[in-house]
C-alpha cells in the first residue's frame, strides 16, 4: 500500500464517475471531501466521508485505499478503545485493494502489509502471521521486497520451530530461500549503484539521480541489517551438532536430490563441519549424480580439510571453470581470492579478486580482500618508513570502494578503512615529510600509486 504518490484532486468531473454516480451520487462529493481533509492530515474529519465511499463505492477511485490506510492507522493509534475494530477494517482494506485496483496494488504487497499490521499491533499469533507471509513469499517471491517482512517471515518460523510446531529442515530450507532473496536484491542494488558511481565521483549526477542513488543505498543498508539479524536468529540451530544428525537421518532418502545435496554440503562447509565423514558422503553423492561447479567446489573443501591445498585449489579452479553464471562465478573467484590470501599467495589472491570484479562490478567483498592484501604488504613496498606506511592510504581507499558499490558492506568497509587510515602517516608526519599532495609509486607486487593527502 505504500506508494510514493502525490494526489492532487482538482475537479472531480461528473463524467469520470458517471456509472457510480448513477448508483450513489454522494460518493464523488464525499471522495473530494475526505481527500481534502486527508491531504492536510485531518484524519478524524476525513473518516466519515471516507467510510461512506469505502462502504458504498469501493471501486470509485484508488484514493479510497491510499488515504484509507492513513486514516485507519490514525484511528488505531488515537482510539485505543476501538483499536481492534479499526485493525480489522484495515486488514479488509488490504485484502480488497489489489482486487479492486490490480494495476496499482498487488496481492504480495497487500499480504505483507496485513502481516506487518497484525505483528505491529500484536493482534495475530505467530502461526497466523507466518502463514500470511509464507503465502506472500511462495506465491510471488519476485514481488517480496520488504526487508522487515523478510526478517519477520524467518523469525516467526524459527519461533514456531522452537515451540515444536515446525521441523528443522523447513527452517533451513526457508533460510536458503530468504538469504537467496537478499542476495538477489543486493545484486540488483549493486548493479544500480555501479551505473551511477562514476558520475557521482565526477560530481555530475542530476538531482533525480542523487535521490535514486540515496534511496538504493538506504535499501542496501536495510538488507544489511536484516541479513545479520536473520543469521543471529538462526543461531545455534545451524551448528554441526544439529546439522550432522539431521542430514544423516535424511541422507538415504534424499541422496538423489542434487538441490538438497548442494544445500546440505554448502551449509556444512560454511559452518565448519567439513571434517565430518558425512560431508564426504554428501560431496561424493553430488559429484556422482551431477558433476558441477558446486560439486567440484565442495571437493576442494574436502581436500582443504585434509590439508591437501594443492589438490583443493585444483578443484576450486575446476569449479570456477564449470560455472556459467557470471555472478556465481564471481562469488567462487572471491572465495578463491580469500583462500589464496589466507595462504599468503598475494599475487594470486589479487588476480582472483580482480577477475571477480570484472565479472561482477557490483560485488564489494573483492575490494575488502584487496585492501587487506595491500595493508599486509606495508613492509614490502617503499624504501622509507613514510612510503611503507603510505600503502595504508591505498588500503583505506580500496576498502571504502567496497562500501560504495555494496551498501550491505557499508559498516564493515568503513571500519576497515578507519583501521587502515589509523596506521597511515599522521598529519604531523605528512607536514614534516613535505610530501603533501605528492604521488608515491609502489614498486612492488601491489603496483599503482597513491596521492599523499593534504591533511
Task: Describe the function of each predicted region.
Residues 1-27, 69, 308:
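Bacterial Sec-dependent N-terminal signal peptides
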Residues 23-278, 289-290, 414-420, 430, ...:
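Preference for long, solvent-exposed alpha-helical segments and helix-linker "stalks"
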Residues 35, 70, 116, 301-302, ...:
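Residue-level recognition of tetratricopeptide repeat
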Residues 51, 95, 134, 248, ...:
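Alpha-solenoid helical repeat scaffolds
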Residues 66-68, 113, 298, 335, ...:
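Canonical tetratricopeptide repeat
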Residues 128, 273-278, 308-314, 343-351, ...:
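Structural signature of tandem alpha-helical TPR/SEL1-like repeats
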Residues 297-309, 316-364:
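Alpha-helical adaptor scaffolds
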Amino acid at each position: 500500500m505504500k506508494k510514493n504518490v502525490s494526489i492532487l484532486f482538482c475537479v472531480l468531473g461528473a463524467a469520470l464517475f458517471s456509472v457510480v454516480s448513477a448508483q450513489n451520487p454522494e460518493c464523488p462529493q464525499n471522495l473530494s471531501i475526505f481527500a481534502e481533509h486527508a491531504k492536510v492530515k485531518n484524519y478524524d474529519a476525513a473518516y466519515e466521508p471516507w467510510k461512506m465511499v469505502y462502504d458504498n463505492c469501493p471501486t470509485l477511485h484508488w484514493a479510497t485505499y491510499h488515504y484509507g490506510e492513513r486514516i485507519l492507522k490514525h484511528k488505531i493509534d488515537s482510539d485505543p478503545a476501538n483499536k481492534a475494530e479499526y485493525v480489522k477494517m484495515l486488514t479488509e482494506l488490504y485484502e480488497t485493494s489489489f482486487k479492486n485496483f490490480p494495476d496499482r496494488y498487488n496481492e504480495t504487497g497487500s499480504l505483507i502489509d496485513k502481516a506487518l499490521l497484525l505483528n505491529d499491533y500484536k493482534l495475530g499469533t505467530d502461526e497466523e502471521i507466518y502463514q500470511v507471509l509464507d503465502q506472500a513469499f511462495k506465491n510471488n517471491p519476485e514481488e517480496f521486497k520488504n526487508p522487515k517482512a523478510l526478517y519477520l517471515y524467518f523469525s516467526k518460523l524459527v519461533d514456531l520451530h522452537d515451540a515444536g510446531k515446525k521441523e528443522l529442515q523447513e527452517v533451513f530450507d526457508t533460510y536458503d530461500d530468504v538469504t537467496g532473496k537478499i542476495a538477489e536484491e543486493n545484486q540488483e542494488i549493486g548493479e544500480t549503484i555501479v551505473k551511477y558511481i562514476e558520475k557521482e565521483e565526477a560530481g555530475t549526477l542530476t538531482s533525480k539521480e542523487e535521490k535514486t542513488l540515496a534511496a538504493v543505498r538506504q535499501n542496501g543498508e536495510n538488507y544489511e541489517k536484516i541479513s545479520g539479524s536473520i543469521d543471529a536468529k538462526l543461531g545455534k540451530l545451524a551448528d554441526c551438532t544439529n546439522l550432522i544428525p539431521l542430514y544423516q537421518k535424511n541422507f538415504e532418502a534424499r541422496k538423489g536430490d542434487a538441490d538438497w545435496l548442494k544445500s546440505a554440503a554448502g551449509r556444512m562447509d560454511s559452518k565448519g563441519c567439513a571434517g565430518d565423514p558425512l560431508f564426504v558422503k554428501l560431496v561424493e553423492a553430488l559429484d556422482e549424480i551431477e558433476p558441477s561447479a558446486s560439486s567440484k567446489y565442495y571437493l576442494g573443501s574436502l581436500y582443504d580439510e585434509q590439508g591437501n591445498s594443492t589438490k583443493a585449489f585444483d578443484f576450486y579452479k575446476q569449479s570456477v571453470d564449470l560455472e556459467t553464471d557470471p555472478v556465481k562465478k564471481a562469488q567462487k573467484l572471491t572465495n578463491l581470492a580469500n583462500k589464496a590470501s589466507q595462504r599468503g599467495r598475494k599475487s594470486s589472491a589479487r588476480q582472483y579478486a580482480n577477475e571477480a570484479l570484472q565479472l561482477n562490478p557490483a560485488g564489494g567483498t573483492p575490494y575488502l580482500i584487496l585492501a587487506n592484501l595491500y595493508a599486509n604488504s606495508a613492509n614490502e613496498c617503499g624504501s622509507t618508513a613514510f612510503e611503507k606506511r603510505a600503502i595504508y592510504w591505498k588500503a583505506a581507499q580500496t576498502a571504502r570502494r567496497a562500501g560504495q558499490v555494496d551498501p550491505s558492506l557499508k559498516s564493515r568497509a568503513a571500519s576497515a578503512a578507519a583501521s587502515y587510515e589509523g596506521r597511515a602517516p599522521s598529519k604531523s608526519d605528512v607536514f614534516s615529510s613535505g610530501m603533501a599532495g605528492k604521488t608515491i609509486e609502489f614498486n612492488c607486487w601491489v603496483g599503482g600509486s597513491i596521492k599523499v593527502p593534504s591533511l
